[in-house]
């Protein structure tokens, strides 16, 4: 990333504090957005709202957050706001 230049955000972004359901069923809370230090892409930082998670926080590229996926033969949005 060029110092002082922040990549543009798309019009639709998750907001810190919002809760989302992953297409497989688990719930997550958005912590915020971050810029990947090597790739200059926006990342969503989120935490699981279920017990025994593999990590305290996760990240996912913002462009994947609302993308469509096929799960058990059904098209779903990767994360749906609850």
What are these regions (language model features)?
Residues 1-82:
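Mixed-charge, low-complexity intrinsically disordered regions
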């Amino acid at each position: 990333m060029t110092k002082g230049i922040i990549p543009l955000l798309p019009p639709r972004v998750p907001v810190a504090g919002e809760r989302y359901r992953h297409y497989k069923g688990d719930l997550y809370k958005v912590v915020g957005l971050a810029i990947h230090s090597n790739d200059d892409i926006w990342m969503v930082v989120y935490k699981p709202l279920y017990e025994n998670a593999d990590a305290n926080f996760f990240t996912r590229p913002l462009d994947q957050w609302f993308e469509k996926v096929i799960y058990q033969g059904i098209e779903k949005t990767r994360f749906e706001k609850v």
